[in-house]
From Swiss-Prot:
All cysteine residues are involved in intrachain or interchain disulfide bonds. N- and O-glycosylated. It comes from Bos taurus. Its main location: secreted. This is von Willebrand factor. It is found in: Secreted; Secreted, Extracellular space, Extracellular matrix. Residues 1-22 form the signal peptide. InterPro entries: Mucin_vWF_Thrombospondin_sf, Ser_inhib-like_sf, TIL_dom, VWF/SSPO/ZAN-like_Cys-rich_dom, VWF_dom, VWF_type-D. Multimeric. Interacts with F8. One of its GO terms (cellular component) is extracellular region. Residues 294-347, 651-706 form the TIL domain. One of its GO terms (biological process) is hemostasis. Residues 33-201, 385-559, 864-937 form the VWFD domain. The gene is VWF.
Amino acid sequence: MFPTRLARLLLAVALTLPGALCGEGALGKSSMARCSLFGADFINTFDESMYSFSGDCSYLLAGDCKTHSFSIVGDFQGGRRMGLSVYLGEFFDIHVFVNGTVLQGGQHVSMPYATRGLYLETEVGHHKLSSESYGFVARIDGSGNFQILLSDRHFNKTCGLCGDFNIFAEDDFRTQEGTLTSDPYDFANSWALSSEEQRCPRVSPPSSSCNVSSELQKGLWEKCQLLKTASVFARCHALVDPEPFVALCERMLCACAQGLRCPCPVLLEYARACAKQGMLLYGWADHSSCRPDCPTGMEYKECVSPCHRTCRSLSITEVCREQCVDGCSCPEGQLLDEGRCVESTECPCVHAGKPYPPGASLSRDCNTCICRNSQWVCSNEDCPGECLITGQSHFKSFDDRHFTFSGVCQYLLAQDCQDHSFSVVIETVQCADDPDAVCTRSVTVRLPSPHHGLLKLKHGGGVALDGQDVQIPLLQGDLRIQHTVTASLQLNFGEDLQIDWDGRGRLLLKLSPVYAGRTCGLCGNYNGNQRDDFLTPAGLVEPLVEHFGNSWKLRADCEDLQEQPSDPCSLNPRLTKFADQACAILTSPKFEACHSAVSPLPYLRNCRYDVCACSDGRDCLCDAVANYAAACARRGVHVGWREPSFCALSCPHGQVYQQCGTPCNLTCRSLSHPDEECTEVCLEGCFCPPGLFLDETGSCVPKAQCPCYYDGEIFQPEDIFSDHHTMCYCEDGFMHSATSGAPGSLLPEAVLSSPLSHRSKRSLSCRPPMVKVVCPADNPRAEGLECTKTCQNYDLECMSTGCVSGCLPAPGMVRHENRCVALERCPCFHQGREYAPGDRVKVDCNSCVCQDRKWNCTDHVCDASCSALGLAHYFTFDGLKYLFPGECQYVLVQDHCGSNPGTFRVLVGNEGCSVPSLKCRKRITILVEGGEIELFD
């Protein structure tokens, strides 16, 4: 037998050489060995032994029988194939049933599914389970036929019902005990997998009685002979001997109850065996009237790309390396969607794993997206930028870069660095209750004309204008300041600037798109590129956050932040376990609805940092979780996370906690002067119960007890007075009259408190080149020692909250370290080093020279880089770092975007990372100009 078999193999090689199979039906010969379970009870082994076996248990079909890294098991019941199971070692199992149900570890999963190097998907009507790492492919078709393919690495290393894969059919019937037998039932029964839960019965061959009429038997016999006589099958005779298939077909005639379709499984198996050898038998199904059944709306084809077009892949130009297979596919022009064929206009869209029908819309920030042809078509409006400070000096820039900077000084948070129309400065101090922590004590804002005043938002919720405390709400032209929740304030200036300040250190700064690309400071430059967020006043991007933060320091007498701990948990092991467990709520199902809208990872890092850095980690935990919940609420996802035993919020007497309340028109004052421009937003906090309003004492009262605010005066309920012969009376917080006159000015006067106290430093004399400055008592905007100019802050605006007398550098000179220097002698700074005027540095492909304290750089467009590091770390062209532990192959970069036909594509994937016996490696595939290059370590 071997010489004949070898001759057939050599002939197959010759016929598949380049140019040998050029016409219709040619297909590259597969390099994988194939085992098939088909028909009612037939098995075709890797070495092409065919036999019958009707099992009633679980049996080993194939696997790694040397190191036992994986096993493929067939599950039978009453002679019927029920499904396939794959076991990886002793602790992982996945089960695929003929009906498409999938269980992994006892849990239902849906396709597609990837885990531990295994990929489960639906392919042309087949359920396919494959693994490049383990070297196998298993398929179950719609008729319950099984196909198992093994790579040549398993040559002579497998065992089970599919044989031993060594090209010798003579030793295929080797039992689990190692003996050879000629009885297929003795062989197959030996591979039954009994367990304590399931004892496998020994299966016997069925009876051989014939229940088919002679006339039908003749018709079936003639159909079996088609394998030898029909021209459509004759094309493959040189590659696959039809005799064993004809013999098998004839043997099953008496046992089959499906009429003229009884031979069809054998004919299908012959066609698949030919395709395995590289020969496609187009038309065999029609010629033999054996076209396999397909789901409604689909049609059978002898050659279908396994990378079939679906609604989800409509916008992706896939790279398909696998050969075509026979199976069910959609008619030309239609796409597969969840098992049915549809027109492209019927394709749904997917967002955050949830499908949306055609025409559905979503709001994303300030834009609206509509589902069309499986793609989201979105408006392209520029959205407001948000800069956020939370917890222990955690920042989120306008371009969503998260960082921590714990310097103690006054810093420029954000400024219009083109027109200088506004500035926002923060003051940070050591926290009073925790000397190791840094808190934001106040926020100072300088607004555009005609105000030109300094507004200070103080710790505790107070507000000062040019050093004088003012009463809230404050409404002056475009400027509006109002209380939102408890001690929280909201400052609005027109529609372009908004500040939310909670009075305890949490700050949100929102700017309209008119400022995009125009800002500078700790919040970044608002240009959509995270890579240049650490831009300094000198014009260079710093790699270290400490150098970046120090460059925006406004006061000369503050120490630079030299180094800050990247992970306080490493310094406080006692709190590490508590931090990990407590902060895990952010990634728990409690916040699952928000994960697709706001990534929890930066907030999780901040939570661990704060809990470990805080003297009372539990208090900081609640603030950290609240910060993430607030970010979710801003994206329209409201999470009720507080519980009586976890971070319960204690409200003042008479107020109630609301997870989502509105700040608008909740006070007695708002009854007299409703704020029609208030933005209805969702805020967590303490509110008066429905029907009650907050009075000036902080108590919740019914409107009948609210005073009235009229013409700058306060009137108690039921007060009556005469105004120009009109009788006016106060009722329900509103001044009523016999006429319809307006109820006075909508702009309450600022209530001034104690006058600004001027601080001074006693100095009898100043040594040259210092000069003495004495603050005038009659000028609240005077500047003194607190505004000392240095080489680093010379171009930054000083916001004085109180003049300090003392010694300052003479005109034309500035302070550098502890000496006075001429302005033109100031150095430039980069990466913590000083550079003298005229010095040069190289930044990417540009050259920068130090001139007038700033770096003057060439403006070449430099090459950008995207990195894939380790198993799951990615660094985009624009500097975004993210974690994605996907187990499939993904497009790393391509220029096949939109209607662009494209010229290249780079794919990335990890292999062997879930196999203990294999080395994990990264594979990069480069497709360019019709060529393919693969790189792997």
